[in-house]
Amino acid sequence: MIIQRVVLNSRPGKNGNPVAENFRVEEFSLPDALNEGQVQVRTLYLSVDPYMRCKMNEDTGTDYLAPWQLAQVADGGGIGVVEESKHQKLTKGDFVTSFYWPWQTKAILDGNGLEKVDPQLVDGHLSYFLGAIGMPGLTSLIGVQEKGHISAGSNQTMVVSGAAGACGSLAGQIGHLLGCSRVVGICGTQEKCLFLTSELGFDAAVNYKTGNVAEQLREACPGGVDVYFDNVGGDISNAVISQMNENSHIILCGQISQYSNDVPYPPPLPPAVEAIRKERNITRERFTVLNYKDKFEPGILQLSQWFKEGKLKVKETMAKGLENMGVAFQSMMTGGNVGKQIVCISEDSSL
């Protein structure tokens, strides 16, 4: 069977910005027969995420991410439907997901590496398993729970950078749900600012591309900052940290502004900002959601419940077609998405 797949065509270089041309589509032949334990799947949706920038380097800089190899198929979060099965627990028509889904129209995968999902948890929106009811949702929820130290009724202010992205848009809402009295988002367009305040319930939004970020933050957070959900790093984070209160907490989710720079993770703070952090006893600990696998199942159920109750609003930016994986990735890395960036590979007619 001839299928299409996306391979890594070139590396952007350690300090280069990724472009769509770093990827290419090619035809590939799948084996005709399945081995015991394997399933053939048709890909429905694929995810592009900031962490993938690290996988484009020969050395990802982290021990839990393997680099993509040149001329080899790329992979990431994906969801699809089983078309044929030689696995005991999976049958034709089952919907399955994996963090290591190859960027292919169809694939033959080891059934043990797949997780069956229930469409009812997402009211039939299967792509949500790659966003709000999936890894970004868990990252936001567990990050806020484990590193935010929020206690309801204690009048805490939370700031979220990259607030209109996959994790940021959820983290701000979760901050409110868990008891923050004020949530402020930082993003890069007026349209995104309006989206945060009018649709997601953020109390205020700061556009870092217009005006002085520090001044806008002072106005939006008159009582200082108690919890900072950091998706971006760099100058924006320095401005936030400078306004954080004593004994406050940074949730170190991502550093998208630094992923194309050859620096260690998490990147060190400038000396003046690091001095503020130490003086005010601000925690800034590395957060890796994969260390909390025991919390995944209850986390997914909590996120699903909030979504069904209308308390957690979900936003996606959807591209179509495998040939647009590189375009979608480049756009996501430069803030072109609102909410989770997804690529629809094929529609499913059985839903």
From Swiss-Prot:
Domain of life: Eukaryota
Binding site for NADP(+): 165-168, 192, 208, 231, 253-259, 287-289, 337
InterPro entries hit by this protein: ADH-like_C (IPR013149), ADH_N_2 (IPR041694), GroES-like_sf (IPR011032), MDR_fam (IPR045010), NAD(P)-bd_dom_sf (IPR036291), PTGR2 (IPR037399)
Main location: cytoplasm
Residues annotated as transmembrane: none
GO CC field: cytosol; mitochondrion
Catalytic activity: 13,14-dihydro-15-oxo-prostaglandin E2 + NAD(+) = 15-oxoprostaglandin E2 + NADH + H(+); 13,14-dihydro-15-oxo-prostaglandin E2 + NADP(+) = 15-oxoprostaglandin E2 + NADPH + H(+); 13,14-dihydro-15-oxo-PGF2alpha + NADP(+) = 15-oxoprostaglandin F2alpha + NADPH + H(+); 13,14-dihydro-15-oxo-prostaglandin E1 + NADP(+) = 15-oxoprostaglandin E1 + NADPH + H(+)
Protein known as: Prostaglandin reductase 2
Organism from which the protein derives: Mus musculus (Mouse)
